[in-house]
Curated annotation (Swiss-Prot):
Expressed in the facial nucleus and the ambiguus nucleus of the brainstem, pons, medulla, spinal cord and cerebellum. GO terms for cellular component: endoplasmic reticulum membrane; neuronal cell body; neurotransmitter receptor complex; NMDA selective glutamate receptor complex; postsynaptic membrane. InterPro entries: Glu/Gly-bd, Iono_Glu_rcpt_met, Ionotropic_Glu_rcpt, Iontro_rcpt_C. The chain crosses the membrane at residues 575-594, 642-661, 833-848. Residues 952-985 are annotated as: Involved in the trafficking and surface expression of NMDARs. The lineage of its organism: Eukaryota, Metazoa, Chordata, Craniata, Vertebrata. PANTHER family: IONOTROPIC GLUTAMATE RECEPTOR (PTHR18966). Residues 595-615, 628-641, 849-1003 are cytoplasmic. Residues 1-24 form the signal peptide. The keyword rRNA-binding does not apply. It is found in: Cell membrane; Postsynaptic cell membrane. Residues 883-912 are annotated as: Disordered. This is Glutamate receptor ionotropic, NMDA 3B. GO terms for molecular function: ligand-gated monoatomic ion channel activity involved in regulation of presynaptic membrane potential; signaling receptor activity.
Length: 1003
């Protein structure tokens, strides 16, 4: 066979030489014919249009500069056909012009690859082939002039991954199951060299007849033996397509661990009909064709740069290649030197780390995922990531060890999951267990206080034996515990619960995750159930279910009782209301006075003509008495209109006073202040003043958000943060408070506000950073999809709403019904303004008294001496009396003494003394009733001023005339009454006559 291939290649080379001599290439290659200040790298383009366009786009990028002012020129050449003769002619034409140091090719079939390797070795010119894995085949001894870069995963790399898995599981006896492999013996040899151990069985399925019977019969050799053992530990399936691999795995007998060696994408992984625990490889981040071409060009450029620095004469004068006269260039030729530098070049390219292994294989960085077929708690198959392989290093996922190993077929045992939680009200509460260490209500959970996996395993083992100390036993209950119990019931699994050791949600510290995230990554728990916020950083390392609770971040502050200012008693009513009330009072008093004086029945001289008058001052006194509800003696209006207006004013005052009284207690007792924050963008948070402190919970989602969004704010609040939410609330409510504001999940803050007995807490500002709570699981856990599905069902059925109503239906502050014994007390500081007002009233009373004396001694005499402003009865009865009567008693006595002269000059006659007393009585009576007369009558001429003056005789005559006139009127009235009684038959007519006869006799 090898001889036939050699003859075929020789014939192709001969045809190429003949064609070169006779007529040359039918189309010009476009390669420059002379060398200049540049070296050339030729590229034989692929035949497929899409691949050709991608290669041209990659070659269009600027080429790197070389030392000594050299430049690398890229020349693209397209060959019309891909037969061996045309390929040989095209390659010879590419290499013929001077300056071409290497070429890049894209073989699409194995014969092309063999021809390129033969031509590279024959012409001693480096040829770099970018190929797919399907083109690869053992080509005999490698040559340094033909370098191969596998765009897809090379077979050697896949075998390295499989060997790493075999060694990690300590599998000794291995069986190779081959589907369609062109050189099975070469593959077995390659496996033996990589694994350092030959496989125990090699099953070639390519020679089998079509049908499942023959396939099952062949694979039965790997099944379980009669004694219960298996002939091999693992079976590796190679060279199979996705459909063929599915057929083989469906027919595989139970027993060995199956490994699928063909890399598959995640979406192509089947789930049904496969044996549990089968391992599958999946390449992630496969390099693109453009990246592979770019790295090949950079490989040549770096090798040329190194060669130009060490051997500039060879880099500046590359020799031309003549396919008609092939001569060995010797060890010092440019091609051999470049090949040597190519095999010793390595760098970090677009595909990752690039290096040449074995002088002909160009390796790039590869990354594989290892997937395993597991079973979820419902028993359904699901793929889970158990490890990853990169650059020869196999790493198992941290949570892979925690995943449940598939139970044997036919078992019905309920799986048992380990759940980690964190105490956060109202989602998770804890209380002490009973005397027996059990929980009548809630779920038994451990509080180990450590994150050590061995310690946890030992405690749960001791829990089954009943030997765990009671101090570590707790009873967990709450929102999330109810949700977990419902999930366990619907998904048919059991769980064991423990509280996270460090009490943290989880953050990246010194390259390691802490808290709940750390427990999931370390495999200590299958899931984390609490108020676990979903954020981008956590989602990169663990999986989350769909959120079962939506929330955001909020700010909580504390209210403070402050001393009421002096004018606090006026707060129940707005200043405009106060002005309106007193304006209405004076206006009502004015209308009461007008209605009373214009009414024929009013308490005025023209109305009822009594001893009292309803003036404006009386109306003001009445309106103030009604407004403040004081019971004092006051004049009331007598006219119906005035009475109606007075009652209407009383209704107005009742409503105003009731509103004032109702609001007074709320305003005075509820006088509280708090930090007004508009939200996370408030200047108080971004530029805090001296003494303003705020914080959050360490390693929580709130801290992660603030740290990523506002680094300066996080630097200030870091030293004021708390380990837990209750601790932060305690810092906020302490006396004196250690925090002015506390930032955390709004759902947690709302609960703390609702249970605050003193009503000192409240949330302020706009919510921000909308987030949700989900159940955390290891990456690619088979539980994620099932849990998310059931959570969605709970939302639709209303179960989530029932949980919210159960744990969040608290009575908020301001709407609570206080106990009978609980009273709202107001101290002196609440009504300090009233005391100040009373003191001001006492001071103003002194000023009023001073004003009275000023009016009495200065203003009143001036008005009395004038002729105007003598009628004040409608305004004030007191002022009117003072103006329209004689001098006061003291002044009158002094005036009488002045008029009478010395005592010894006045005779003390009894008649004169008696007459003086009568005169004084008349004067006093006149002073009491004189205001009832008209102004003209009241101001009549009374000539007497002194009792002993010259006007006594005139006064006596006037009095006698008045008495006589009165007697005449009385006599006429009595006569008329007698006539009327005579008509009625009354015999009492003589009585008035005696009165009339007695009157003249007395006179």
């Amino acid at each position: 066979m090898e001889c036939v291939q050699t003859l075929w290649l020789s014939l192709a080379l001969a045809l190429a030489r003949g064609s070169w001599v006779v007529r040359g290439h039918p189309q010009p290659c476009g390669v420059p014919t002379r060398a200049g200040a540049s070296v050339r790298l030729a590229a034989l383009l692929p035949r497929a249009p899409a691949a050709r366009a991608r290669v041209l786009a990659a070659l269009a990028t600027p080429s790197p500069r070389l030392p000594h002012n050299l430049s690398l020129e890229l020349v693209a050449v397209a060959s019309p056909t891909r037969d061996p003769a045309s390929l040989a002619r095209g390659l010879c034409q590419v290499l013929a012009p001077p300056g071409v140091v290497a070429s890049i090719t894209f073989p699409e079939a194995r014969p092309e690859l063999r021809l390129l390797q033969f031509l590279a070795a024959a012409t001693e010119t480096p040829v770099l082939s970018v190929l797919r894995r399907e083109v690869r085949a053992p080509l005999g001894a490698p040559t340094p002039f033909h370098l191969q870069l596998d765009w897809a995963s090379p077979l050697e790399t896949i075998l390295d991954v499989l060997v790493s898995l075999v060694r990690a599981h300590a599998w000794e006896d291995i069986a190779l199951v081959l589907c369609r492999v062109r050189d099975p013996s070469g593959l077995v040899t390659l496996w033996t060299s990589r694994a350092s151990q030959a496989p125990k069985f090699v099953l070639d399925l390519s020679q089998l007849d079509s049908g499942n019977d023959s396939l099952r019969a062949t694979l039965a050799l790997l099944g379980t033996l009669e004694g219960g053992g298996t002939p091999v530990s693992a079976a590796v399936l190679l060279g199979c397509s996705t459909a063929h691999a599915h057929e083989v795995l469906e027919a595989a007998p139970p027993g060995p661990q199956w490994l699928l060696g063909t890399p598959l994408p995640a979406e192509a992984l089947p789930k049904t009909g496969l044996p549990p625990g089968v391992l599958v490889l999946g390449e992630t981040g496969q390099p693109s064709l453009e990246a592979a071409v770019h790295d090949m060009v950079e490989l040549v450029a770096r090798a040329l740069s190194s060669m130009a620095l060490m051997h500039p004469e060879r880099a500046l004068l590359p020799a031309a290649v003549n396919c008609e006269d092939l001569k060995t260039g010797g060890s010092e030729s440019t091609a051999r030197t470049l090949a040597r530098f190519l095999s010793n070049t390595s760098f970090q390219g677009r595909t990752g780390a690039v290096w040449v292994a074995g002088s002909s294989q160009v390796h790039v960085s590869r990354h594989f995922k290892v997937w395993s077929l597991r079973r979820d708690p419902l028993g359904a198959p699901a793929w889970a990531t158990v490890g990853s392989w990169q650059d020869g290093q196999l790493d198992f996922q941290p949570g892979a060890a925690a995943l449940r190993v598939p139970s044997p077929s036919g078992t019905q045992a309920r799986p048992k999951l380990r759940v980690v939680t964190l105490v956060e009200h109202p989602f998770v509460f804890t209380r002490e267990s009973d005397e027996d260490g059990q929980c009548p209500a809630g779920q038994l959970c451990l509080d180990p206080g450590t994150n050590d996996s061995a310690r946890l395993d030992a405690l749960f083992t001791a829990l089954e034996n009943g030997s765990v100390p009671r101090t570590l036993r707790r009873c967990c209950y709450g929102y999330c515990i109810d949700l977990l119990e419902r999930l366990a019931e619907d998904l048919a699994f059991d769980f064991e619960l423990y509280i996270v050791g460090d009490g943290k949600y989880g953050a990246l510290r010194d390259g390691r995750w802490t808290g709940l995230v750390g427990d999931l990554l370390a495999g200590r728990a299958h899931m984390a159930v609490t108020s676990f916020s979903i954020n981008s950083a956590r989602s990169q390392v663990v999986d989350f279910t769909s959120p079962f609770f939506s929330t955001s971040l909020g700010i909580m502050v504390r209210t403070r009782d402050t001393a009421s200012p002096i004018g606090a008693f006026m707060w129940p009513l707005h200043w405009s209301m106060w002005v309106g009330v007193f304006a209405a009072l004076h206006l009502t008093a004015l209308f009461l006075t007008l209605y009373e004086w214009r009414s024929p029945y009013g308490l005025t001289p023209r109305g009822r003509n009594r001893g009292t008058v309803f003036s404006y001052s009386s109306a003001l006194n009445l309106c103030y008495a009604i407004l403040f509800g004081r019971t004092v003696s006051s004049k009331t209006p007598k006219c119906p209109t005035g009475r109606f207006l007075m009652n209407l004013w009383a209704i107005f005052c009742l409503l105003v006073l009731s509103s004032y009284t109702a609001n007074l207690a709320a305003v005075m007792v509820g006088d509280k202040t708090f930090e007004e924050l508009s939200g996370i963008h408030d200047p108080k948070l971004h530029h805090p003043s001296q003494g303003f402190r705020f914080g959050t919970v360490w390693e929580s989602s709130a801290e992660a958000y603030i740290k990523a969004s506002f680094p300066e704010m996080h630097a200030h609040m870091r030293r004021h943060s708390a380990p837990t939410t209750p601790h932060g609330v305690a810092m906020l409510t302490s006396d004196p408070p250690k925090l002015n504001a506390f930032i955390m999940d709004k759902s947690l803050l709302d609960y703390e506000v609702s249970i605050d007995a003193d009503c000192k807490l409240l949330t302020v500002g706009k919510p921000f950073a909308i987030e949700g709570y989900g159940i955390g699981l290891p990456q690619n856990s088979p539980l994620t999809s099932n849990l998310s599905e059931f959570i969605s069902r709970y939302k639709s059925s209303g179960f989530i709403d029932l949980l919210h109503d159960k744990w969040y239906k608290m009575v908020p502050c301001g709407k609570r019904v206080f106990a009978v014994t609980e009273t709202l007390q107001m101290g002196v500081y609440h009504l300090s303004g009233l005391f100040v007002l009373l003191c001001l009233g006492l001071g103003s009373a002194l000023l009023t008294s001073l004003g009275e004396h000023v009016f009495y001694r200065l203003v009143l005499p001036r008005i009395r001496r004038g002729n105007k402003l003598q009628y004040w009865l409608h305004t004030s009865q007191k002022i009117h009396r003072a103006l329209n009567t004689g001098p006061p008693e003291g002044q009158q006595e002094r005036a009488e003494q002045e008029c009478s002269g010395p005592k010894e000059e006045q005779p003390a006659a009894d008649g004169a003394g008696r007459w003086r007393r009568v005169r004084r009585a008349v004067v006093e009576r006149e002073r009491r009733v004189r205001f009832l007369l008209e102004p003209g009558e009241a101001g009549g001429d009374h000539p007497w001023l002194c009792s002993n003056g010259p006007g006594v005789q005139a006064e006596l005559r006037e009095l006698e005339l008045r008495i006589e006139a009165a007697r005449e009127r009385l006599r006429s009235a009595l006569l008329r009454r007698g006539e009327l009684r005579a008509q009625l038959g009354d015999g009492t007519r003589l009585r008035p006559l005696r009165l009339l006869h007695a009157a003249p006799a007395e006179s």
